[in-house]
Design a protein with these regions (language model features):
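N-terminal amphipathic/basic-hydrophobic helices that include classical n-h-c signal peptides
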Residues: 1-15
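Core catalytic alpha/beta fold that binds nucleotide/phospho-ligands
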Residues: 11-215
Length: 215
């Protein structure tokens, strides 16, 4: 567990092949700690961060970049300033240099106040995080499989159930590399084999889902 003032980082999955980091932040404004952390990312990433209109989005983008670098450095022993990333439009970022002995797959997600980042050495990985809040139930017919809709409607905590399903679906489609361009209603995250590859956690008021598929 790591503390930077109001920033908390913890590992919620820690196995030989997979690490998942959760970051929570209560900071409302950009400050000295963010200037400090900016020194750990590339000039290109800083430029991208600065293009965001709102400070909250800039901070989340910075956290996602820093925690990704932290995870890779810890896993590989490569120095931070040696890391080079390829970030194709609308696709998962990859580590383009240096070459590692073991192929790495990683993914991150952020929402208001939190970042989730996952890294795996033997699987493709997709992650998603959402704060539990008032859910947009009017979207269920467009995005939920009938079995998922039944699960939500029969739950005693419908908001939590909605975001459980939503994060599972996001994590799965990110892991598959399709994103949300597919017919989401056709994907049942509660049925095998999909459900066997997804883990979902509640962490500090957030729903976190992690999908891994063996390479």
């Amino acid at each position: 567990m790591v503390h930077f003032s109001s920033i908390l980082i913890c590992i919620i999955i820690n196995t030989m092949s997979t690490k998942v980091y959760f970051l929570k932040d209560n900071t409302e404004n950009w400050g000295p700690v963010h200037d400090y952390l900016s020194g750990f990312v590339s000039a290109e990433r800083r430029e991208k961060i600065n293009r965001y209109k709102f400070e909250s989005d800039r901070m989340l983008s910075l956290y996602a970049a820093v925690i990704t670098r932290l995870a890779i450095v810890r896993e590989t022993g490569i120095k931070n300033d040696e890391l080079v990333f390829d970030c194709p439009y609308m696709k998962k970022p990859t580590l383009s240099a240096p070459m590692t002995d073991t192929p790495l797959d990683f993914n991150f997600s952020h929402t208001k106040g939190a970042v989730l980042m996952g890294l795996s050495t033997d699987s493709t990985i997709g992650v998603d995080v959402e704060r539990i809040r008032k859910a947009p139930f009017n979207t269920m017919k467009m995005v939920c499989h009938p079995a998922e809709a039944d699960y939500i409607n029969n739950s005693s905590d419908k908001e939590k159930a909605f975001f459980e399903i939503w994060t599972k679906k996001e994590a799965y489609t990110k892991c598959m590399g399709t994103g949300l361009s597919v017919d989401l209603k056709s994907i049942n995250t509660l049925a095998a084999p999909i459900c066997e590859n997804i883990e979902t956690f509640i962490q500090d008021g957030y729903v976190c889902s992690v999908c891994t598929l063996k390479k």
